Amino acid sequence: MREIFTARAERNETSARGESADESFAHLVDGFRRFRTEVYPEQQALFARLARAQQPRAMFITCADSRIVPELITQSSPGDLFVTRNVGNVVPPYGQMNGGVSSAIEYAVMALNVQHIIVCGHSDCGAMKAVLDPAGLQQMPTVKAWLRHCEVARSLVEQNCSCAAGEALGVLTEENVVAQLDHLRTHPSVAARLAGGQLSIHGWVYCIETSEILAYDATSGRFAPLDGDGPLPVATPAPRYLQA
């Protein structure tokens, strides 16, 4: 969401690229035409299979920021990811707001039987900037209310982290992912599958500039490179009721 959270942007006829509104939309239509004529014919068998059913490998909960493309980051094909996006990659605790995110989680777990749920934050997150400095949200009451689900992360950083100048945003971004993982575990469908060893959860932070992903490891309480040496960082709690 970039600077929209720190300064009220005045919309005009041109976009950040210097295009008019008509030119911006024409770019999207041209892209669709290329998809129809160049991409779809080569993937027609895949789309024919997907037209009948979906069986995604994972659920991917991430920010609405236009710079984050889950399928690109993970090199996934259509049908591989069940993606849910919102401002700040928020997962409301169960019962507080049983809306789009909560229903998507329940459907992914109970109907699609996903075996992995990834909560992915990212660098330069406008939502996290707004959590640190909410003054720019006065004209966006809905966003302000939504970001209250990030308050636990802000409070944790404020009371426990002696961050140097410029470090608070990165630390908050990581702590927000951990907080949303905690919220995720309050959902009955998730809690039951975790306890039975049928579901794994993952917390990632993606760096837009470098393409690096840091993953949360619950045992150490730290984030480590996803493609680093050694075992993969694991955010999943130990199962208590392993299926026979």
Map each language-model feature to its residues:
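N-terminal active-site beta-alpha-beta segment that forms phosphate/nucleotide-binding
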Residues: 50, 54, 61-71
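Divalent-metal-activated hydrolytic enzyme cores
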Residues: 2-56, 89-115, 126-244
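Structural motif
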Residues: 57-60, 80-82, 115-118
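Catalytic core of membrane glycerolipid acyltransferases/transacylases, capturing the structured
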Residues: 67-87
